[in-house]
């Protein structure tokens, strides 16, 4: 394991705490984030995707913000694609909001839904704009989702036009399983 070999010095110093599980069999983004935040011991928790890294001064900046303000959460600028999953908030707010919704499986949307619930609970969304905090390791999109259930098990996808606002979706999985549903654009449909 790379982490045990490369980061043992920091693990032994207590700077890095490392947890690993072999369950579930496929990567589940919402579940992994919930587990990390539940295992965290600090008052302020931050999610940072594995392909991201922060610049010097980020922790100090966040601690100052959370010491001086109440009922807030920080995200990166949501216009930048590769840093979308970042969020910092007080651990108690995470627990009270019940974490990420684990119904969301696959890539994306779990962040948006979680941020929306925080806003509905009266928290204020702040955005850190310092360019030194926007560091990412560049890689192909395929690497981003390589361990996800859909990529490992999906065999075919069929789309059936219903009307300008609705499309029926049939997903065939390996092992003779399938999923079916309708994608509907409610906003466009109501105009």
Residue ranges and their predicted role:
Residues 95-116, 127:
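Donor nucleotide-sugar recognition loop
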Residues 23-40:
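Glycine-rich, basic loop-to-helix element that forms the pyrophosphate-binding segment
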Residues 112-191:
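C-terminal catalytic/acceptor-binding lobe
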Residues 1-24:
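Acidic donor-binding segment of Leloir-type glycosyltransferases
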Residues 45:
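Short aromatic/hydrophobic "clamp" motif used to bind/position activated sugar donors
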Residues 41-42, 85-98:
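Conserved nucleotide-sugar donor-binding
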Residues 49-53:
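The conserved acidic donor/metal-binding loop of glycosyltransferases
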Residues 59-85:
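Conserved donor NDP-sugar-binding/catalytic core segment of glycosyltransferases
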């Amino acid at each position: 394991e790379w982490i045990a070999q490369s980061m043992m010095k920091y693990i032994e110093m207590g700077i890095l705490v490392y947890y690993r599980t072999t369950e579930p069999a496929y990567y589940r983004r919402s579940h992994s984030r919930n587990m990390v935040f539940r295992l965290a011991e600090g008052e302020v928790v931050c999610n940072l995707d594995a392909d991201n890294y922060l610049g010097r001064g980020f922790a100090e900046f966040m601690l100052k913000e959370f010491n001086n303000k109440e009922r807030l959460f920080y995200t990166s600028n949501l216009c930048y694609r590769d840093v979308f999953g970042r969020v910092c908030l007080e651990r108690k707010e995470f627990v009270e909001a019940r974490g990420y919704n684990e119904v969301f499986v696959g890539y994306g949307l779990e962040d948006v839904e979680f941020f929306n619930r925080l806003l509905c609970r009266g928290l204020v969304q702040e955005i850190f704009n310092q360019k030194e905090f926007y560091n990412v390791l560049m890689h192909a999109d395929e690497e981003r989702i390589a361990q996800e259930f859909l990529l490992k098990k999906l065999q075919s996808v069929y789309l059936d036009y219903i009307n300008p606002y609705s499309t029926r979706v049939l997903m065939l999985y390996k092992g003779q399983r399938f999923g079916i549903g309708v994608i509907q654009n409610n906003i466009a449909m109501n105009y």
